[in-house]
Amino acid sequence: MSCEVLRKLEEVIRRRIEEKNPESYTYRLYSSGMHNVARKVGEEAVEVAVAALAEGKGRVVEEAADLLYHLLVLLNSTGLSLADVCAELEKRMR
């Protein structure tokens, strides 16, 4: 299964960061520093777990989408990409 939307989202994130538009949530988050980006990823991960335990499937999907977005921002902030994660997953499947 391929999820092309993640690659597109990764490109949007990269572009928003390059544009340095202070009205962009993505740019503001990125500019706030790695500590804040990592904290946001942690918050979103907890929200996915809470949704899985106490809320419906729709809520889990919504929170998982938030987590994936914030994880892509974190990867970009560290100079990594979705391709790096995919390569690691492929290695683990051998």
From Swiss-Prot:
Pathway: Amino-acid biosynthesis; L-histidine biosynthesis; L-histidine from 5-phospho-alpha-D-ribose 1-diphosphate: step 2/9. It comes from the Archaea. It is an enzyme of class 3 (hydrolase). GO terms for cellular component: cytoplasm. Keywords: Amino-acid biosynthesis, ATP-binding, Cytoplasm, Histidine biosynthesis, Hydrolase, Nucleotide-binding. Its main location: cytoplasm. The keyword 4Fe-4S does not apply. InterPro entries: HisE, PRib-ATP_PPHydrolase-like. Its EC number is 3.6.1.31. It is found in: Cytoplasm. The keyword Amino-acid biosynthesis applies. GO terms for biological process: L-histidine biosynthetic process. GO terms for molecular function: ATP binding; phosphoribosyl-ATP diphosphatase activity. It catalyses: 1-(5-phospho-beta-D-ribosyl)-ATP + H2O = 1-(5-phospho-beta-D-ribosyl)-5'-AMP + diphosphate + H(+). Gene3D superfamilies: MazG-like. Belongs to the PRA-PH family. This is Phosphoribosyl-ATP pyrophosphatase. It comes from Pyrobaculum neutrophilum (strain DSM 2338 / JCM 9278 / NBRC 100436 / V24Sta). The gene is hisE.
